[in-house]
Amino acid sequence: MVGAYYVGIALLVAGGSQTAAGVDQYDLEQTPDNGFSRLLALDEMLRSRFLRKSRNPKDNLMLSEANEERTPSSPSNSLTEFIVSEPITTNVMRTE
C-alpha cells in the first residue's frame, strides 16, 4: 500500500515537470506588464519635476537635501517662546 502511494507521487511529479517543460517561452515574454514600467517612468518624472526650488520669491519653501521634501526654510522663525509667570504655576500646584 505504501509502495502505491510512492508510485502515485512519482507519477504526479513526472507529469507536472512535463507540463512545465511544455510551456512556450515566447508566450511568457509577450505577457503584458499592466503599465508597471510606465508607472515607474511617471514616478521618476514627477519626482524630478516637483522637487525643484520655487522661482516665486514669496514662496518660503526650499528643497531640503536631507529628506528630499519641501520644508519651510526656517522653522525657528515661526516659533515663539511662551513664558509662564510664577504666580500661575504656584496656583496650579497642589499642596498636600
Swiss-Prot record:
Job description of the protein: Secreted effector that dos not suppress the host cell death induced by cell death-inducing proteins.
Keyword terms: Host cytoplasm, Host nucleus, Secreted, Signal, Virulence
Signal peptide per UniProt: 1-22
Comment block on domains: The RxLR-dEER motif acts to carry the protein into the host cell cytoplasm through binding to cell surface phosphatidylinositol-3-phosphate.
Family per similarity comment: Belongs to the RxLR effector family.
Polar residues biased stretches: 87-96
Motif (RxLR-dEER): 49-70
GO CC annotations on file: extracellular region; host cell cytoplasm; host cell nucleus
Location (main, coarse): secreted
Compartments where found: Secreted; Host nucleus; Host cytoplasm
Start and end residues of each stretch annotated as Disordered: 57-96
Protein name: Secreted RxLR effector protein 123
